[in-house]
Design a protein with these regions (language model features):
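ATP-dependent helicase/translocase motor core
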Residues: 1-213, 222, 226-238, 259-263
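Conserved helicase motor
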Residues: 221, 242-252, 267-273
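Signature of the SF2 helicase/ATPase Hel1-core->accessory helical subdomain module
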Residues: 61, 106, 272-286
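Short, hydrophobic beta-strand segments that form beta-sheet elements in well-ordered domains
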Residues: 85-86, 243-244, 286
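Hydrophobic positions in the central parallel beta-sheet of the AAA+
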Residues: 216, 264-266, 286
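Conserved motor-coupling elements within RecA-like helicase/translocase cores
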Residues: 246-264, 276-281
Length: 286
C-alpha cells in the first residue's frame, strides 16, 4: 500500500514553514558560495535572491544576474528545487527562472492587481505583491511551467499582468457556468504573452470547473498551428496532450468521444449552419 506525501500545503499557507536565510553557505565540488537570501518553504530552497547596493553605480541588477549564473555553474544542486530567482538593487527589482536571460527577468508592478499605478515597480510593490505567502504558493503551483520539445525545455514564470488577468478570468468562468455562459473578453497587447496566458488559464480551468473540455477556436490556420504548438510544448503542465480537429466531423467526434477533459484546437471555418449542435454536453469551454 502506498501513500501520497505532499511537501507543500497549497490550500492553507499557514500550515507551511517559511524561512528566509541571509548568507546561507553552500559547498559543492570545492566551491564555497553564499547567496544573499534564500527562501526555504518546508526546508526546500525555492527562491534565491541576489542583492546589490544601490549606492554603487558600477554594481547593479545586471551584476546580480551574472552572480546567479555563476551560482548555477558552481553549486548546481542548490537549484534542483529552485522555482524563482530574484535580482535587486532596490531601484530595479525583477524575477525570473534558472533558464531566463537577463531580458526575461520581469518586474512585478502591483500589490493587488490594481493597474492604476504600474509605470514603475517600486521595491515594496515588488516584494509585497509577489511574496505574500498565499500568492507565492499560488505562483509556485499554477504559474510556473516548462515549455519545450524535450531537448532543452525553458522554465517560464508568469508576469504580474498574466497572473492577475488569468485569476480574474477564472472567477468570471465560474460565474458564467451559473449564469449566461459568457466568460467575457481577455485582452492582451501584442507581444505580451497571450498564448502563455491561455496555457495558464487552461491549466487552472481543469480544477476550477471540474475537468471541462476546452475548445480553442481561431480565425486563421497559422494562428491555430501556433497556439497548438505552444500548448503541445506545455503538455506536462496541462497534464494532457492537445489535439487539432481536422474537419467538422472530426471535431464532433472529438467532443462526443469524451465526457470530460481534452484540449481541442479548431478554426471557425469548420463550423457551419445546421439544425443539430456539435455536442449536447454542458462542460465545454470555448
Amino acid at each position: 500500500r502506498s501513500s501520497v506525501v505532499k511537501l507543500i500545503d497549497y490550500a492553507d499557507a499557514d500550515k507551511n514553514d517559511f524561512y528566509v536565510v541571509n548568507q546561507y553557505t553552500f559547498v559543492e565540488n570545492g566551491n564555497n558560495r553564499r547567496p544573499d537570501i534564500i527562501l526555504f518553504i518546508n526546508g526546500l530552497p525555492l527562491v534565491l535572491m541576489e542583492l546589490k547596493s544601490p549606492s554603487k553605480d558600477e554594481v547593479g541588477a545586471e551584476n546580480a544576474y551574472n552572480q546567479i549564473r555563476n551560482y548555477i555553474k558552481d553549486i548546481p544542486s542548490m537549484f534542483y528545487y529552485n522555482a524563482i530567482c530574484v535580482i535587486s538593487d532596490l531601484s530595479t527589482n525583477k524575477a525570473g527562472t534558472i533558464t531566463s536571460g537577463l531580458d526575461r527577468f520581469m518586474e512585478w508592478k502591483t500589490k493587488d492587481g490594481d493597474y492604476e499605478n504600474t509605470a514603475y515597480a517600486q521595491f515594496d510593490t515588488f516584494y509585497e505583491g509577489m511574496f505574500q505567502k498565499a500568492r507565492l504558493l499560488d505562483i509556485l503551483k499554477n504559474f510556473i511551467l516548462f515549455s519545450g520539445d524535450g531537448q532543452k525545455p525553458i522554465k517560464i514564470l508568469a508576469g504580474y499582468h498574466q497572473y492577475f488577468a488569468v485569476r480574474k478570468a477564472i472567477e468570471k468562468a465560474k460565474i458564467a457556468t451559473k449564469t449566461d455562459g459568457k466568460g467575457g473578453v481577455f485582452w492582451h497587447t501584442q507581444g505580451s504573452g497571450k498564448s502563455l496566458s491561455m496555457v495558464f488559464y487552461a491549466h487552472l480551468l481543469q480544477e476550477a470547473l471540474d475537468s471541462p473540455t476546452i475548445v480553442v477556436m481561431t480565425d486563421r490556420i497559422d494562428l491555430d498551428d501556433q497556439l497548438y504548438t505552444q500548448f503541445a510544448r506545455c503538455a506536462p503542465f496541462l497534464r494532457q496532450t492537445p489535439v487539432q480537429a481536422t474537419s467538422k466531423e472530426n471535431l464532433s467526434k472529438l467532443l462526443d468521444g469524451r465526457e470530460a477533459n481534452g484540449i481541442i484546437f479548431t478554426t471557425m471555418f469548420k463550423f457551419e449552419r445546421g439544425e443539430k449542435p456539435l455536442s449536447e454536453r454542458r462542460n465545454i469551454v470555448v
